[in-house]
From Swiss-Prot:
GO terms for biological process: spliceosomal snRNP assembly. Residues 131-164 form a coiled coil. The gene is Gemin8. Keywords: Coiled coil, Cytoplasm, mRNA processing, mRNA splicing, Nucleus, Phosphoprotein. The SMN complex catalyzes the assembly of small nuclear ribonucleoproteins (snRNPs), the building blocks of the spliceosome, and thereby plays an important role in the splicing of cellular pre-mRNAs. Most spliceosomal snRNPs contain a common set of Sm proteins SNRPB, SNRPD1, SNRPD2, SNRPD3, SNRPE, SNRPF and SNRPG that assemble in a heptameric protein ring on the Sm site of the small nuclear RNA to form the core snRNP (Sm core). InterPro entries: GEMIN8. Residues 72-82, 96-108 have a biased composition (Polar residues). This is Gem-associated protein 8. Residues 66-127 are annotated as: Disordered. Signal peptide: none annotated. The modification Phosphoserine is found at S122. Its main location: nucleus. Residues 113-127 have a biased composition (Acidic residues). It is found in: Nucleus, Gem; Cytoplasm.
Length: 238
């Protein structure tokens, strides 16, 4: 397996691709530096004493997430309360009106929740008796037509998905592969094209391939310079 991996990885380790890999590593270093800078800014923002005094942290900060575990359903396991609430120390002579008001509002919320649960339970218990429902011929035709429409729409969606997968943009060739993968390429660039040219033109394949490459390079150069807009391939009907 190791020998096969070296054989497949040898062609893109060629020095001719060194400049590409150099740009690739520079881009990866820039992305990692950007992520580190964003992480540091996020940590400093959420731990700033001027923005969040008295230890009040937003629910999506790292310190808040570390101090509050989550269960398997993604719900909070601690007491459900606002993460922005700040707990100030009470003075000895301070009245307890705020706490009594909070307890009263909590009881009111619990009572409303219980009423909503009872209403939802009573709604779930309502059942429709369809045993005496009259099924006419018009209703049967309606159901049959609805089922036909659903089947036609399902087939049309499948055809649209297949057509979209096979669609090739105007700025790409017929052999353009738009599927992305993290795996290294299994064959060398132009290997399939060279084999096809060899099969078609025999010993004259290198000469014809060089001419085609020159024409393609000239076309790409003028396209990069002029930036033309591709005309849609639409048949004209007179």
């Amino acid at each position: 397996m190791a020998s096969n991996w070296r054989a497949s990885a040898s062609w893109y380790s060629h020095p001719v691709y060194a400049r590409y890999w150099q740009h690739y590593h520079h881009a990866m270093l820039w992305m990692q530096g950007h992520q580190n800078a964003y992480r540091k800014f996020r940590d400093s923002y959420f731990t700033s004493p001027w923005l969040f005094p008295h230890g009040a942290l937003p629910w999506n900060s790292p310190a808040y997430e570390a101090g509050h575990p989550w269960d398997s359903q993604g719900q909070h396991m601690a007491q459900q309360e606002s993460p922005y609430r700040v707990s100030h120390p009470k003075s000895p002579g301070q009245p307890l009106r705020n706490s009594s008001r909070t307890q009263a509002s909590t009881r009111g919320n619990e009572a409303r929740c219980e009423e909503e649960e009872l209403e939802s339970d009573s709604d779930d218990e309502v059942e429709c008796d369809l045993s005496n429902m009259e099924i006419t011929e018009e209703l049967r035709q309606y159901f049959a037509q609805t089922e036909r429409h659903r089947e036609e729409r399902r087939r049309q969606q499948q055809l649209d998905a297949e057509r979209l997968n096979d669609y090739v943009n105007a700025d790409h060739g017929l052999y353009f592969n738009h599927r992305r993968s993290l795996e290294p390429p299994s064959e060398k660039p132009w290997e399939r094209r060279q084999a096809e040219m060899k099969r078609l033109y025999g010993n004259s394949a290198p000469k014809i391939l060089a001419m085609e490459t020159a024409v393609q390079l000239s076309f790409d150069k003028h396209c990069d310079r002029k930036q033309p807009k591709y005309w849609p391939v639409i048949p004209l009907k007179f």
